[in-house]
Regions:
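Residue-level preference for the first positions of well-ordered beta-strands
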Residues: 41, 239-241, 269-271
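Conserved SF1/SF2 helicase motif Ia
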Residues: 257-273
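Walker A/P-loop
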Residues: 235-260
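Accessory nucleic-acid engagement/destabilization modules that flank
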Residues: 1-204
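Hydrophobic helix-cap positions at the C-terminus of alpha-helices
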Residues: 33, 232, 261-262
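Conserved pre-motif I regulatory segment
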Residues: 22, 208-243
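Phosphate/oxyanion-binding active-site loops and adjacent basic polyanion-contact surfaces
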Residues: 18-23, 67-72, 218-225, 247-251
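Short, hydrophobic/aromatic alpha-helical segments in well-folded domains
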Residues: 29, 228, 257-258
Length: 273
């Protein structure tokens, strides 16, 4: 039987989670959290994020030695070797920064904590990952088309979109990594957060709205405003603005519209700010 590469040790049960198990779990969660166009990229980032834990130094550290070992940059190097730019760059920022935050880009000969500076460092051999983890093939052309969509020939828009998607991928990766780590390392079984049932939520909203009396002129006006908002929300658009006065029921009306749109467009989540 080959060497066991440990990612985490549960201090309560003394059980170990292998690097392979953690990377595969993180990859699946990262894909689950991502929008459809980013799922494959998110999966690859999750698969590669802890490749550096295959270093001998990290394995000595996880087994009790009081030494410091940098591991996150190794995954960034690995995706840089596997995938072309700018796809690999997006993953590199996220993987290198998944413990400390997205680093500055830096320049070719840097020796600081920028992405370039960190990737210029020398690390122990971590090629053992190739025996346990297979980084997936990605559809480069499809991803490039998604990145360029809606940007036209405007370079600033393209840069802004790349920056936004990098931060989005970073959020997916950090959430996936911390969720899997927490679930393994806690003393009791963790109940995964529930997935909202938008159909049932909409039913409850409708029951509550139907329970309101519509007798006074104010109540009738409020009902008319809400119905107008519901009708207009069926028109196809990317952004909707609800301009209703205080006390007219914007909170419930906006919640109902969001649920209706989420169901109709098969969205996975609603973000309420």
């Amino acid at each position: 039987m080959g060497e066991i590469y440990i990612a985490h040790r549960n201090e309560y049960t003394n059980e170990v989670q292998t690097v392979r198990e953690h990377c595969e779990n993180t990859a699946n969660l990262c894909k689950e959290y991502a929008i459809p166009e980013m799922e494959d990229l998110a999966y690859a980032a999750g698969k590669a994020h802890d490749i550096g834990k295959y270093q001998e130094g990290f394995q000595r550290r996880i087994r009790g030695e009081n030494i410091r070992v940098e591991h996150s940059t190794c995954g960034a190097i690995a995706v840089g070797e596997k995938y072309p730019k700018p796809m690999n760059l997006m993953m590199q920022y996220c993987i290198a920064g998944h413990h400390t935050g997205i680093p500055n880009g830096g320049f070719g000969n840097d020796e600081d904590n920028s992405l370039k500076g960190r990737m210029n460092r020398t690390f122990e051999d971590y090629d053992a990952y190739k025996q346990e983890l297979e980084l997936p093939e990605l559809d480069i052309r499809k991803w490039q088309q998604f990145l360029a969509a809606d940007c036209g020939r405007n370079a600033d828009w393209l840069i802004d979109k790349f920056t936004f998607l990098t931060r989005y991928l970073f959020s997916c990766l950090v959430d996936a990594d911390s969720t899997d780590t927490a679930e393994f390392c806690r003393s009791t079984e963790v109940v995964r957060k529930l997935q909202a049932d938008f159909e049932k939520c909409l039913e409850k909203i409708n029951v509550q709205l139907q329970a309101f009396e519509v007798k006074t002129e104010l109540q009738k006006t409020r009902s008319l405003l809400q119905e107008q908002a519901y009708r207009n929300s069926t028109k196809d658009a990317h952004i909707y603005l609800i301009n209703m006065p205080t006390g007219s029921g914007k909170t419930l009306a906006s919640a109902k519209i969001a649920l209706q749109r989420a169901i109709a467009k098969k969205k996975k989540r609603i973000i309420y700010v």
